[in-house]
């Protein structure tokens, strides 16, 4: 689903707190100059998959371990591919979408619900089509929720709430997400950490959505509800194998019908992040960067953007000097 893979991690997780941010084929091909012979790798197959971990090197001796994450996972989705552990061990700091620990307090959920709530004189029913409202009511009944309570919230909030609830039913939780796993570990180990953006920035993205954009987000969520379980499993398998092509095709099959939402939640954020990552590389820093896997895929993804900046990008299994 679009929501689970592209929407900001902290916002998505906050909604799970109230009830909650991308198939084993081949890896996306690397450019000829960026590739190393497969036999040069120091990692051997271990049953955990190839993993979404890329090593980015600059001429200034900077190195980023660019790790694609899934923000919500199940216990059975572990262990992670060995590249994640190696990236943590060999990095000097952690870089996440948000600084470690930011937005984990109850105040975030409260602020989010306030932003997502209509004023007393209107409702969800009054702001979406009859078909959408009927579908929301049916979903609420199926999940044991009161439609009257949901009627108080804006379409964007309801969209994420529905997505979060569906993943919770599958046993997927942000407490098991890759981001949370390494964020908690870094804090316990005293490893420095920083974020690419802030919670307030993420929340304001939703506050800025037009009524049309909100309805598009809700309509897309409703259309995908019946396929959540199957699509989630496919997404996990593609992620485990580091198959960016499969991930991109899967995550954006429907999302690309809404280019303005894609730009807001993915493309525009990547363009801001790439400047920060580029600066780290030029300063010679060595960091583990954890972002939603969706941010790595496609021509507008971080991998291609880093290559265009002149950096060498290789899958970790093709790197000997890890």
Where in the sequence are the language-model features?
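Polybasic, lysine/arginine-rich low-complexity segments
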Residues: 10, 26-27
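C-terminal motif of bacterial Sec signal peptides marking the signal peptidase cleavage site
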Residues: 22-24
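A cross-kingdom marker for long, charged
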Residues: 260-322
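Bacterial N-terminal signal peptides that target proteins for export
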Residues: 2-14
């Amino acid at each position: 689903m679009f929501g689970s893979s592209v929407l900001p991690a902290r916002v998505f997780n906050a909604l799970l707190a109230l009830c909650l941010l991308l198939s084993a084929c081949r890896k996306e091909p690397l450019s000829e100059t960026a590739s190393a012979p497969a036999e040069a790798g120091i990692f051997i197959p271990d049953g955990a998959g190839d993993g979404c971990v890329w090593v980015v090197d600059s001429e200034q001796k900077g190195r980023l371990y660019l790790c694609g994450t899934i923000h919500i996972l199940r216990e059975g989705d572990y262990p992670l591919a060995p590249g994640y552990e190696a990236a943590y061990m060999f990095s000097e700091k952690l870089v996440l979408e948000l600084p470690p620990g930011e937005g984990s307090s109850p105040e975030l959920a409260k602020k989010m619900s306030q932003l997502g709530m209509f004023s007393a004189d209107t409702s969800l029913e009054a702001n979406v089509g009859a078909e959408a409202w009927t579908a929301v009511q049916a979903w609420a009944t199926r999940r044991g929720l009161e439609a009257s309570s949901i009627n108080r919230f804006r379409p964007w909030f309801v969209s994420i709430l529905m997505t979060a609830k569906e993943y919770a039913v599958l046993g997927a939780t942000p407490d098991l997400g890759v981001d949370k796993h390494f964020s908690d570990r870094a804090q316990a180990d005293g490893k420095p950490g920083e974020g690419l953006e802030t919670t307030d920035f993420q929340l304001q993205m939703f506050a800025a959505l037009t009524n049309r954009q909100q309805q598009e987000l809700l309509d897309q969520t409703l259309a995908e509800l019946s396929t959540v379980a199957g699509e989630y499993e496919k997404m996990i398998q593609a992620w485990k194998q580091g198959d960016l092509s499969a991930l991109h095709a899967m995550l954006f099959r429907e999302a690309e019908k809404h280019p303005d939402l894609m730009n807001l939640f993915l493309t525009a954020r990547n363009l801001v992040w790439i400047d920060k990552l580029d600066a780290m590389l030029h300063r010679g820093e060595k960091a583990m960067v954890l972002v939603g896997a969706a941010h790595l895929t496609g021509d507008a993804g971080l991998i291609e953007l880093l290559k265009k900046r002149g950096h060498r990008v290789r899958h970790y299994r093709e790197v000997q000097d890890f």
